[in-house]
Amino acid sequence: MNVTNEKMRFWSPEVRELEPYVPGEQPKIQNLLKLNTNENPYPPSPKVKAAVETVLVDQADALRLYPDPDASLLKQAIAKQQHLSVEQVFVGNGSDEVLAHIFKAFFIQDEPILYPDISYSFYPVYSQFFGVQTKQIPLNDHFEIVVEDYQQNNGGIIIANPNAPTSIALSLKNIEQILKNNPDRVVVIDEAYVDFGAESAASLVNQYDNLVVCQTTSKSRSLAGLRVGYALAQAHLIAALEAVKNSFNSYPIDRFAIAAAVASFEDQAYFEEQCLKVIQSREQLIEQLETIGFDVLPSKANFIFVTHPAHVAIELAKALREQGIIVRHFNKPRINQYLRITVGTDEQNQRLVNTLKLFIN
């Protein structure tokens, strides 16, 4: 909505200057193949459906009551899955909310926080919103993080691993080096896509008192529609996040979301099966795209980042859209000739490849 300057007089000055995050579009197109927001192509575990039905049918009267503000059952399920204590788990209304609390709790410092110049575009939004100083660290020519670049004065560090939108993962060894180089600052590893082949830093939580790991149920557990994210850290860091949460919204997760997420964590076999299917489809898709001339960055996510030396990325995106296929293009320096493509089912990926062949050939 366009608001005139005259009507903006009611706005807080800070809000007038905000540059909000722009989410991937959710278009209403017939026979749409949606490969632009990294949603899982497979449904959640059948146990999730059963859990939601139980809340709706057997516990409907309880909907008049607020949900558990601590989401205790969910924290217990996450702690069990991650081999941590409940005191080392924080939950929120999607990992974006968890990240917002992280910025508020740890990053308002006298020195700038560090993050890659090409990364999740919510980081600069939160930085502006909370008045956090920032310094963007350029990825190298291969779009990789250079660990040594993060050995400088800072107010904290946040790294998406695997990185978005590049899909490239940082090794656990390199993450540990960043932690060791910054013992007096909080280092946040944002692991929205970690379950598709990268190494999680959750195994380092008990070793480093400056580490926060942020994860989500939206991608690998197919629960993007219910908004459940969480952080893993030592108890003293979790306490700061709880203080921020309870100063903002004491009941961030509803009964349906709690029940669904708990059920998801209780069905590990289904979770692993779906992740493997996405990984296998990703590798097959990469091979198919490389065959028709695309350059594809090495991916450990449920999406790939591709460019074609003979075709303009935005034109390819427009051509795909005309055929009912939506992918993500970022009109930003260094990556404006790339497309981010969510990995679909094998059938969906084949439709994508067949459509691209019409333009490439």
Curated annotation (Swiss-Prot):
The yes or no answer to whether the keyword Acetylation is present is: no
Task: Give GO terms for biological process.
Answer: L-histidine biosynthetic process
Known Pfam families for this protein?
Answer: Aminotran_1_2
Sites of N6-(pyridoxal phosphate)lysine modification: K219
Q: Which GO terms describe its molecular function?
A: histidinol-phosphate transaminase activity; pyridoxal phosphate binding
The metabolic or biological pathway listed in the UniProt record of this protein is: Amino-acid biosynthesis; L-histidine biosynthesis; L-histidine from 5-phospho-alpha-D-ribose 1-diphosphate: step 7/9
Write the protein's name: Histidinol-phosphate aminotransferase
